[in-house]
Design a protein with these regions (language model features):
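Karyopherin-beta/Importin-beta family HEAT-repeat alpha-solenoid scaffold
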Residues: 25, 42, 172, 181-185
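Basic, helix-initiating cap at the start of DNA-binding domains
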Residues: 1-35, 43-47
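Amphipathic C-terminal alpha-helical segment
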Residues: 146, 150-169, 181-185
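Alpha-helical DNA-contacting segments of helix-turn-helix folds
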Residues: 63-76, 118
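Amphipathic alpha-helical segments used for helix-helix packing
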Residues: 98-125, 155-159
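Amphipathic alpha-helical packing segments from all-alpha helical-bundle domains
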Residues: 119-147, 173, 177
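Helix-turn-helix
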Residues: 31-64, 68
């Protein structure tokens, strides 16, 4: 799991505390996915059976809860991308970009509505940093070209997903065209 800097929540060190932390996240995800989304520490305490001070120990605000969920899902997405890259074993950057776009689109669609939290500024930076390092290790393109390609991918997929709640095959194809056109020119 990538280390995140400047996060607003406190990751526990002890196993017992980690279980409480995970329970809070699980409950927060459940509430977030409800139709009448209103994520509050009071509701989490009520549903999870944990005391509010225990929750505030890890999450000083509602925003810190959302950030923790965002980081969790961003890390799951990054792990999935890395697994797909390893299983394919391509050294061709264009092919890796196509796989990257497909994996992100599938993850977003399969994990909605929680997946919209991947588009927080913090998560987008985490995604770009991790993928830049990964693609730089196998690519013959310069770092700036890859960095901007990742920005194109994230912007296109974010636009499509936030507008529609899913990503159509046409939007995936257009994202690939835009990114690959930039990359090769």
């Amino acid at each position: 799991m990538p280390i995140t800097k400047n996060q607003s929540f406190i990751k526990p060190k002890q196993e017992r505390s980690q279980k409480r932390f995970d329970e809070v996240i699980k409950t927060a995800e459940f509430i977030y996915m409800s139709d009448d989304y209103d994520l509050t520490v009071q509701d989490i305490a009520k549903i999870s059976g944990l005391k509010r001070p225990s929750i505030y120990k890890f999450f000083p605000s509602n925003e810190s809860l959302l950030e923790a969920i965002s980081v969790k899902h961003t890390n799951k997405l990054l792990l999935l991308i890395k697994k797909n890259f390893k299983s394919v074993n391509y050294k061709n950057t264009s092919e890796l970009i196509k796989i990257l776009i497909d994996v992100i689109a599938i993850y977003l669609t399969n994990n909605s509505p929680l997946s919209n939290l991947i588009f927080t500024d913090h998560s987008k930076k985490l995604i770009k940093d991790e993928l830049l390092e990964l693609l730089n290790s196998v690519s013959n393109y310069n770092e700036l070209k890859i960095k901007y390609s990742l920005s194109i991918i994230i912007s296109c997929l974010e636009e499509a997903f936030m507008k529609e709640g899913n990503i159509s095959p046409q939007q995936i194809a257009e994202t690939k065209k835009a990114c690959l056109h930039y990359l090769v020119n």
